[in-house]
């Protein structure tokens, strides 16, 4: 999706994300700092960005997870709450300081959900196709991986506009 700013006086809409590649999923205008917070699909990630409606500049929020599932903004304080996950953990809830740019882990559901599960490592693995396009992918190693043994391989690569999440 795209994000537009509608001017009530002129009755004109201007695209804020015309030259922005990630797909807009959701947007919230924050009363506290006047910024627009956008949840986006960005390749095989789901990230949060800020958009300054005065100049259209978009910046990524430095979240601690690869997939942001949901977020909420405080009305009267510089705080963004979000929860998300990465390849090796389940949902975690964070408080993000909008002024200082720091994440604080509030609750780790991953500890309970994954306490009896051994996880291997996940590594990015990108390659160039014959036409020069970079194909983004990753591979998963089993728990207690031994490089001297042979294993079946699971390969995932990003190849479309609406990805399978990490």
Predicted regions: what they are:
Residues 1, 41-46, 86-89:
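Short, solvent-exposed loop/turn segments at conserved positions within beta-propeller repeat blades
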Residues 1-32, 40-41, 51-69, 98-121:
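Multi-bladed beta-propeller domains
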Residues 11-14, 34, 46, 91, ...:
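Glycine-centered loop/turn positions within well-structured domains
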Residues 13, 46, 58, 162-165:
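Conserved protein kinase catalytic core
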Residues 35-39, 80-83:
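Residue position within the beta-strands of beta-propeller blades
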Residues 70-166:
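Serine-hydrolase catalytic core recognition
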């Amino acid at each position: 999706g795209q994000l537009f700013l509608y001017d009530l006086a002129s009755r004109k809409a201007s695209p804020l994300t015309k030259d922005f590649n990630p797909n807009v999923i959701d947007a919230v205008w924050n009363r506290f700092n006047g910024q627009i917070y956008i949840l986006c699909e960005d390749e095989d990630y789901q990230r949060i960005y800020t958009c300054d409606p005065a100049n259209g500049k978009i910046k990524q929020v430095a979240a601690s997870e690869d997939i942001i599932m949901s977020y909420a903004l405080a009305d009267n304080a510089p705080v963004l709450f979000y929860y998300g996950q990465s390849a090796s953990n389940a949902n975690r809830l964070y408080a993000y300081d909008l002024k200082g740019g720091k994440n604080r882990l509030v609750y780790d559901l991953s500890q309970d959900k994954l306490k009896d599960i051994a996880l291997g490592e996940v590594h990015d693995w990108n390659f160039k196709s014959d036409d020069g396009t970079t194909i983004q992918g990753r591979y998963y190693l089993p728990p207690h991986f031994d490089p001297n043994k042979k294993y079946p391989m699971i390969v995932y690569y990003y190849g479309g506009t609406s990805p399978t999440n990490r």
